[in-house]
Amino acid sequence: MSSSKRIAKELSDLERDPPTSCSAGPVGDDLYHWQASIMGPADSPYAGGVFFLSIHFPTDYPFKPPKISFTTKIYHPNINANGNICLDILKDQWSPALTLSKVLLSICSLLTDANPDDPLVPEIAHIYKTDRPKYEATAREWTKKYAV
């Protein structure tokens, strides 16, 4: 199956059965460039926010993972100022069996359960580990400022 057929199939699956609190689709007519949105999980400091992500599929998808980055600013130990996401399934744990739907759900759960032991932003990870109320207050502040 070619990458464009696989991407088209994932798009129709997403439209038919969208994952909770996520949506995604192509930007214009470019099947290899998508935009996604994730609703901040209710049980997280990101509640009430809508976060946008940019998705670029490589031409050898699904043998290589999509490149996904946040375009909405977010305060999180695993997401840096450029919107890059530190998530194992987007790197060495990628498998062609994974779908964009599963990846979006993994990003959603990263918002609820950060991984401060594998941080992209060590300063935020340190605050997350040593002063959780301060971390949550700052994350809520950024959510109100950039994602509402």
Swiss-Prot record:
Coiled coil: none annotated. Its EC number is 2.3.2.23. It catalyses: S-ubiquitinyl-[E1 ubiquitin-activating enzyme]-L-cysteine + [E2 ubiquitin-conjugating enzyme]-L-cysteine = [E1 ubiquitin-activating enzyme]-L-cysteine + S-ubiquitinyl-[E2 ubiquitin-conjugating enzyme]-L-cysteine. It holds the Pfam family UQ_con. One of its GO terms (biological process) is protein polyubiquitination. Induction: By heat shock and cadmium. This is Ubiquitin-conjugating enzyme E2 4.
